[in-house]
Amino acid sequence: MIDPDGFRPNVGIVLMRQDGQVFWARRVRRDGWQFPQGGMNTDETPVEAMYRELREETGLLPEHVELLGATPGWLRYRLPSRAVRRNERQVCIGQKQVWFLLQFTGDESHLKLDHTDTPEFDHWRWVDFWYPVEHVVMFKRGVYARALRHLAPLAQSLAGPAAVGAMPERALEAWLPGSSAAGHDSPRKRPRKRNGARAMRINND
């Protein structure tokens, strides 16, 4: 399912413990680490897709998490040109994503990376909230910065500002225009501080 602009609808998952640490996983047979994410099926809502991807990639069920909030609408990133398959009938140039923040309420024994026959990840660990912005593959850094910035007030309301804190300067540079990692829909000016209101409205354009 690819939209007229060439973007595939997708969901991303930030799974967070009560202390503000987030789930960070290594892709199978690769050195790259990332958050769980995956494409939406045509008959799914973003929330339905999120719970399906959560189970497929981590083995977790809805009773193992609490949904804290989501980004308002789509956040986009472009694929590097080497990853774009130009010979396909519908050319996908990137992903448009809704990102969800989940509190992990289960036990670590519930995490099962081999839940499916084709696992996405082979190793995982807990990292600081902003760590992924500086360590994910370069072309995703902008969308990670934007997603975590939207979700940070919700994370702070659970873990506290000392655990989550403000976006570090190096992570902020990925969000600002002019950065090579800024992404498809980066802002035109420095972002303003937002309040902690929960962002649950999702625009299915």
Curated annotation (Swiss-Prot):
<dbReference type="Pfam" id="PF00293">
    <property type="entry name" value="NUDIX"/>
</dbReference>
<keyword id="KW-0378">Hydrolase</keyword>
<feature type="compositionally biased region" description="Basic residues">
    <location>
        <begin position="187"/>
        <end position="196"/>
    </location>
</feature>
<dbReference type="InterPro" id="IPR022927">
    <property type="entry name" value="RppH"/>
</dbReference>
<dbReference type="InterPro" id="IPR020084">
    <property type="entry name" value="NUDIX_hydrolase_CS"/>
</dbReference>
<protein>
    <recommendedName>
        <fullName>RNA pyrophosphohydrolase</fullName>
        <ecNumber>3.6.1.-</ecNumber>
    </recommendedName>
</protein>
<dbReference type="InterPro" id="IPR015797">
    <property type="entry name" value="NUDIX_hydrolase-like_dom_sf"/>
</dbReference>
<comment type="similarity">
    <text>Belongs to the Nudix hydrolase family. RppH subfamily.</text>
</comment>
<feature type="domain" description="Nudix hydrolase">
    <location>
        <begin position="6"/>
        <end position="149"/>
    </location>
</feature>
<comment type="function">
    <text>Accelerates the degradation of transcripts by removing pyrophosphate from the 5'-end of triphosphorylated RNA, leading to a more labile monophosphorylated state that can stimulate subsequent ribonuclease cleavage.</text>
</comment>
<feature type="region of interest" description="Disordered">
    <location>
        <begin position="178"/>
        <end position="205"/>
    </location>
</feature>
<feature type="short sequence motif" description="Nudix box">
    <location>
        <begin position="38"/>
        <end position="59"/>
    </location>
</feature>
<dbReference type="InterPro" id="IPR000086">
    <property type="entry name" value="NUDIX_hydrolase_dom"/>
</dbReference>
<dbReference type="GO" id="GO:0016462">
    <property type="term" value="F:pyrophosphatase activity"/>
</dbReference>
